[in-house]
Amino acid sequence: CDAAALRSRGWDHVTYGSISSTLGAAKTLKLTEAQTTQAINLAAVANVALRQTRVGEMSMWKACAFSNAARNGLFAAILAQRGMTGPAPIFEGEKGFMKLVSGPFELSRLGGERAPDDTLASFKILDSYIKHFPVEYHAQTAVEAALALRAEVIKAEGADAIQRLSEIEIGSYDVAIEIIGRDPEKWHPTTRETADHSFPYCVAAALLDGRVTLHSFDPHRLRDAALHELMKKVRVVPQPEFAGRYPGAMPTRLTLRTTTGTVYMRQVDVPLGHPGNPMSDQDVEDKLRRLASRRIGLAQVEKLIGFVWTLEREKDIATLMPLLRVPHRDA
């Protein structure tokens, strides 16, 4: 995505997921260079995904899109392992990826954190985003600002102050507005997938509840009249001074106006979990405990955490898989 973003061309970013997953699978399967090349050819030719997944009212498919790409990437690696070839040159060809999907781009040689050559690109895992809140990433700073302002407003004006707000203004930047603050459906979400990709919903939920969790998107919350009333007061506006700051920062300026004319403002530039404001190891562990223990139990989660912290010493990735298995439960 850093070399050639796909969103503006109408393609979904998971298109790259099939290729990156293929490379991970190729390494795990110990494919030769020739086999890996064919695996990439197969993954790229067959897995171009439409951006419609993330526009307007969103469906359950949003949560499946990348996992589907990863599954197809693994399949491409297995096919290449067994001798199947794919069309080439897949990127520079007459009807290839660059001509029809991404546009031209160049990649630096992959290096790593100890690479001696400064021209080599570091491993991108060091630049990964981790979500602190269960909302679309561009909404992370908005939720953080909303929670801080909620405490400030209630302390100053009383417990019912949030319901007495007259206007909620979310100042943001072009990419964020396009993804989660433009479509009319963002003000009237009827699915979890639309709600967690909605500036109005995420901010309103944070202001009303004082927290944003997975339960913030339960069906009964999507129908909550108080939430819908608060969303009507939300305006999303571009902030010219934010132009060009993403992805180094993801700024949100949240302004609340009360019926008495008092104005409260909070700006958050870099969310917790961003490479510029990383979560601690303890934060990441606690997130896994909170989310996974409901499905696999806390004891299994603790074993998983211990295993992952020593993963580089393991000889076979297959030993990880049983720790990810959800126990069967009788109906």
Give the positions of each predicted feature.
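Terminal-appendage/accessory-domain detector
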Residues: 54, 58-71, 78-331
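Glycine-rich, mobile lid/loop segments that gate access to catalytic sites or pores
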Residues: 1-75, 82, 87-94
